[in-house]
């Protein structure tokens, strides 16, 4: 549980801290609730890797100082595609006609996300992700979690 300042207040010393990876869709209606959930998990002593693109991460409010050590912002650069406007990393940055192109660029994050999971799993106990939380747009990410024996939702 968190105190008024966001500091962690443990309700049970027997609870094992988890490492949760959260990778929301690249829209602020998904990013902001995902970040709020990340901070709630961190306030309960869990470690969170919050994955998005560099520009989206830069536009999010920073976690409170007491939680910042437990919330790792992981930047995966969105691949550039012909026809996709420069800097278009969120659906806010796009006309609706470019939505499918944005999804195609997003699919280009499959290999970098897998590499991130490989690195996180290689760090061993305490750093290895326990859970990967995904949006429905991540049709390739569940397989990446399964391949590494990480639970996903």
Where are the language model's segments positioned?
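Glycosyltransferase specificity loop/lid
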Residues: 1-153
